[in-house]
Amino acid sequence: MRTMNLAGMIDHTLLKPEATEKDIVNLCHEAKQHKFATVCINPAYICTAAKLLHGSGVGVATVIGFPLGATMTEIKVQEIFAAKAHGAREVDIVINIGWAKSGNWEAVAKDITRAVEAAHCCGVTIKVIIETSLLTEEEKQKAAEIVKASGADYIKTSTGFAGGGATVEDVRNLKAWVGQSVKVKASGGIRSRETALQMVEAGADRLGTSSGVQIITV
């Protein structure tokens, strides 16, 4: 089982709309203390987190087109450039879920490919959220194929805002569909060490959770 450096696989996450600047400061202190991979926060707090985490080895991740994915592609691209300029090292972007459910896969692919190109142009790691709880198995596989073809760094299960999170089955399937060329981030509902380890065993390379401290200290 891949359990080495579990803390280094965690995106310490706080995306609640009611999160205060004090909450973000506390999140960053926890991330530095436990050496998490990143903090994952809303874009308005990138500068705050970047200053607090400078030189710590903990990265700043933010979200793009979040949580619905229905933002215009041009806006997603500008969000990526702005995130980089303010200090983000990684971005988690949501596919246009409505297009996916409509079977408009060409539009989904164009949207994600442009975002990936923008991210890589400015040296940012990009994770593509497909919102597994809203897709059929066939749609999940098609989305995974598009993410793989786009050249994205990660495929991510969930936003955590759509009523369902990561499952072991989804993580295992996504890993099988994208192979070794794309990493997998499991996110949503990961609140215990046991669940975290199950996700890693299924193929997750990164874990998105607001329960990181609890996971690594029990």
From Swiss-Prot:
InterPro entries in the cross-refs: Aldolase_TIM, DeoC, DeoC/FbaB/LacD_aldolase, DeoC_typeI
Claim: Hydrolase is one of the keywords in the record: no
GO biological process: 2-deoxyribose 1-phosphate catabolic process; carbohydrate catabolic process; deoxyribonucleotide catabolic process
Short name of any one Pfam family annotated for the protein: DeoC
Keyword entries, A-Z: Cytoplasm, Lyase, Schiff base
Pathway(s) the chain acts in: Carbohydrate degradation; 2-deoxy-D-ribose 1-phosphate degradation; D-glyceraldehyde 3-phosphate and acetaldehyde from 2-deoxy-alpha-D-ribose 1-phosphate: step 2/2
EC number: 4.1.2.4
Cellular location(s): Cytoplasm
SMART domains: DeoC
Enzyme class name: lyase
Gene3D superfamilies (UniProt xref): Aldolase class I
Glycoprotein among keywords: no
Active site residues per record: 92 (proton donor/acceptor), 156 (schiff-base intermediate with acetaldehyde), 185 (proton donor/acceptor)
A GO cellular-component term linked to this record: cytoplasm
Molecular functions per Gene Ontology: deoxyribose-phosphate aldolase activity
Catalysis: reaction(s): 2-deoxy-D-ribose 5-phosphate = D-glyceraldehyde 3-phosphate + acetaldehyde
HAMAP family assigned to the protein according to its UniProt record, in alphabetical order: DeoC_type1
Family: Belongs to the DeoC/FbaB aldolase family. DeoC type 1 subfamily.
Entry function: Catalyzes a reversible aldol reaction between acetaldehyde and D-glyceraldehyde 3-phosphate to generate 2-deoxy-D-ribose 5-phosphate.
The protein's name in its UniProt record: Deoxyribose-phosphate aldolase
